[in-house]
């Protein structure tokens, strides 16, 4: 159960990293994104596909470019992560109160 959560966190981290580079360096291709991020090209390609399906980036002949939705999402993301972090912390505290931890 928790390994799935850890995998999802890593996936979100990768997608967010790729999106950040697209916003900062657009237009940018897979090879350059791979070099900058340290992720292999096949993982970058997958992240780009996910981001495109979320309408956060769009392809161009020169490489990926961010949509207007991407900048809004990047501003929204830290607050959402803090909210989720608090929920997990509260879950842990509830288990402590019940004597599970």
Set out the residue ranges of the language-model regions:
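Amphipathic alpha-helical dimerization/coiled-coil segments
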Residues: 76-101
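Short alpha-helical segments that sit at the start of domains
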Residues: 1-18
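Short, locally clustered residues in the helix-turn-helix/winged-helix DNA-binding domain
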Residues: 20-24
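Basic, amphipathic "hinge/linker" alpha-helix immediately C-terminal to the N-terminal HTH DNA-binding motif
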Residues: 62-78
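A short acidic, leucine-rich amphipathic alpha-helix
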Residues: 32-35
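Short amphipathic alpha-helical interaction segments
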Residues: 38-53
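A short, conserved structural fragment
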Residues: 52-62
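Short capping segments at the starts of secondary-structure elements
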Residues: 25-29
